[in-house]
């Protein structure tokens, strides 16, 4: 017979049979080798065909293994020949193919030829229940009246089961999530499916709004018989385009597979509805030089009504791919899927609640569901409901489950800190200097304290974990172990029996005892001990997830934070001196926003700081960032003098399409996208081009800005501070006059520089006073304190006398330049001499660096600490 007339699958089976014979040192390939190869290939379909013919396939494999062991072996024989018995079976296979009119010989005909085989392979199949007539009927059913006319004829058989997923079957098994709401969209989809022509709906909507869920909802309705008569009993099949493309190495393979799918769909008389998720991927899929893509192959079937199809894609991709192909677009009817509102999202989450509770093994409360919908809508602006709300519920549930299964976060942090200190201890032990010895003592003390704390937590955690897991699961486990012990005893496997009897069983019984006592004590509240494990997902857990994802402090304010906000002025005054009015206005704005009273559609606060140079405008902004985020890193500083030209506006929001740098994004918009909760400092704002203020209008009013790529950036969680020197000459000339009078004069000058619509959108215009002599001394203390902190890192202490402090303040005071000359005075009169003395070795570790003013000069006299 001609081996080139075998189908690809059959050729592969013969090659595998040859390898099997060679591995086992068999000199000849026998029918049993080929049978083993066919059953060993999951893609061959031989096992499913035999099962359909009533063969007990699970009995076949052990019998084949036994038959292979009984075959003669020849050591060192490399040339494996086709055995006489196999030749005889192949001849019968060839005759059967000719009788059926097949151009190529398929592997199922080999199985049919084995039905009459007198050898091992035939005997094994007959003993497993093979009957020739049943196998012939199964082959006819699989072929569907088609002949094998190509080498891939076998591969493309049952294409629907290979390349699609049956959603109606999954719905029947209860594997699909319940679909809540979306009745209008499902009804419109059903309406389009019932049309005579162009009965192909395409669901178009933003990512995450529930397009796929609508199709799953349709599948569930079909299963529940909640659809019109024309749709009853139909199947919804999800097309797996990746499976169609995977492994299509040669030209025409992909087209052949898709053609096989379309052919099967054409034969089913419209009983199958194909769902193509990400419909735009069909345009261009499988396209090679001069070949057709999947989109073009679908058009005729769609036009004739042979293919009942539902597509789903996003708005952008529909416009980019489908709309460009007018012939494809006209064959689909659009169903726009909008983003559900917060109320609808809450209803959807309530429907999914039970599924997520089962998956995570925790309880999800109703306040958590409401919080997930509201907080995701408010704070996660770059994604869509209900997807982003479901994500919050899912992640909060996963977090609680993880705490139950593994160490609680507080213990994990302690554990890592203990390891870190142990590593440091080993490194410091090798050093012999005094500083290392002192550090070693500190490490030992801290390690002992942390270890005690960890042990206390571990004791609480173990008790709580035992209570949470409950007794039922442990009882079931004990029951299972005892059943396993009885089985092992019957088999005489006493080593494994001993492991269970003296190892696992006592451990489980101890756990059961602990769980029982923990459950009894669960009702008794122990206020002295912190609770480590949570079993409920509440609103606070959702807020924690949002806070971690966005960096925005959404979580309920703890008492410590409330006190901190109430004393905000004291914190800011530690760094900003002499600007009481400015500090009060800024503090009030932050308190309003954190108390939830500020307008949610605008930034937390927008301020215009006015005043002479060096009075603390930028320093107050830095102090504000430090107060809100415990770090000045969260301050986005933009020097507006860099935006003096008209075209420089594009640098803020990103270049428009077609310009160089389009993909890079804007300087301001990208910074806020990465840190949505931050203080934005627009320094020297009056130096910017007037067009820059047009961009800022929508930021100040609506709290959002559209960048060069059309993405909306959320500024609602930012504090915007603009600084300017405008009116500084009036502020200095009117020193000592009431604040309101100075502000009125400065306001008149502002009107000449900035447009009314810009000024009208700013929350507060804050006028900074010029600094006076008494303020400079307080600022000098702050500057010297920072110098002292730098010296402390070198184990030295700075001690400045009152006389020296007064002299520094006097020499550093300049009413025109504010506090900046003071910084230079500290640098020149203190830092420079001290730096020289340290380098000369006069001052070293554990020394006090005294600074005094004597006889018209600064004096530094060394004393031991």
Swiss-Prot record:
Keyword terms, alphabetized: ATP-binding, Chaperone, Coiled coil, Cytoplasm, Nucleotide-binding, Repeat, Stress response
Coiled-coil ranges (or none): 390-524
Molecular function, one GO term: ATP binding
SUPFAM superfamilies xref list: Double Clp-N motif, P-loop containing nucleoside triphosphate hydrolases
Binding site for ATP 1: 205-212
Residue numbers spanned by region Repeat 1: 6-71
GO biological process, one term: cellular response to heat
Pfam families named in the record: AAA, AAA_2, AAA_lid_9, Clp_N, ClpB_D2-small
Region (Repeat 2): 82-145
Record localization: Cytoplasm
Residue ranges annotated for the Clp R domain, each copy included: 3-145
Residue segments, region Linker: 340-551
Region C-terminal, residue ranges: 771-865
Annotated binding of ATP 2, by residue: 611-618
Stretch list, region NBD1: 158-339
Region (NBD2) location: 561-770
PROSITE patterns the record matches: CLP_R (PS51903), CLPAB_1 (PS00870), CLPAB_2 (PS00871)
GO CC, alphabetical: cytoplasm
Family, similarity comment: Belongs to the ClpA/ClpB family.
UniProt function note: Part of a stress-induced multi-chaperone system, it is involved in the recovery of the cell from heat-induced damage, in cooperation with DnaK, DnaJ and GrpE. Acts before DnaK, in the processing of protein aggregates. Protein binding stimulates the ATPase activity; ATP hydrolysis unfolds the denatured protein aggregates, which probably helps expose new hydrophobic binding sites on the surface of ClpB-bound aggregates, contributing to the solubilization and refolding of denatured protein aggregates by DnaK.
Subunit organization: Homohexamer. The oligomerization is ATP-dependent.
PANTHER family: ATP-DEPENDENT CLP PROTEASE, HEAT SHOCK PROTEIN 104
Record text about domains: The Clp repeat (R) domain probably functions as a substrate-discriminating domain, recruiting aggregated proteins to the ClpB hexamer and/or stabilizing bound proteins. The NBD2 domain is responsible for oligomerization, whereas the NBD1 domain stabilizes the hexamer probably in an ATP-dependent manner. The movement of the coiled-coil domain is essential for ClpB ability to rescue proteins from an aggregated state, probably by pulling apart large aggregated proteins, which are bound between the coiled-coils motifs of adjacent ClpB subunits in the functional hexamer.
Protein name as catalogued: Chaperone protein ClpB
Originating organism: Bordetella parapertussis (strain 12822 / ATCC BAA-587 / NCTC 13253)
Gene name of this polypeptide: clpB
